Amino acid sequence: FTAGRHIGAMVSTEQEHWSLAGGVFGDSLTATNGAAHDQDEGWGLGARATFAPINEKTQVVHLGLGLNYRDTGGLGTTSFKQQPETHIGGINIADTGTISNVTDFYKVGAEVAIIMGPFSAQTEYIATSVSRNTATDLDFDGWYAQAGYFLTGESRNYKNGSFGSIKPKASVGEGGIGAWELAIRYSTLDLIDKDIDGGDVDSYTLGVNWFATPTLRFSANYVDVLNVNGGTYDNQEPSLFQVRSQWAF
């Protein structure tokens, strides 16, 4: 439901309490063959501004606003879909399918985040408006809210309008147990409007993150879809458990 990856150019600037970025983008990275590859996918604009009235080492208040505009060009179609809080499930529990006769669409997102020592919370809302040349325009939206707490006392790292990697107070291999975080998340997505029934989904996630070292992380998440209204998976309530290991260098 968020903006995908496209080839383009972007410029950005930042100071201690604010950041600003904007870019112009062309074709997507995913259309590598078939009809979509031979057609003009249009062009897009993207911009994001952030402001942190409080930006201390362990105390942060973050505000952000983003805008994404997309002209569909010769393709004239678009679609929106989402897996249930995972990238490996292979099932889009909310999916509009192909929306035809689309001239352009835009997305507006607002974000708020705070850090208070070992506690952090953030929320984001995204609204999408789709313009069609032979049918009524469409509106979709979604939002999430999440919170986390470090049992070992660390704080999330924040710089230039985004969160960075976690540095444990005492890493594994250096006499410590790393950084341990408990997390919770709630999200909702509504892809139903007019003649499009892509589904309305609500779900929550419980998670544990273990940062063994500054470059090694392990995560475990339990996701429960509370309900699906409409769409292909109407009235379904799936749940899943997923683990992840990550080495960054």
PLM segments and residue spans:
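Extended hydrophobic secondary-structure segments that form protein cores and membrane-embedded regions
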Residues: 61-71, 179-186
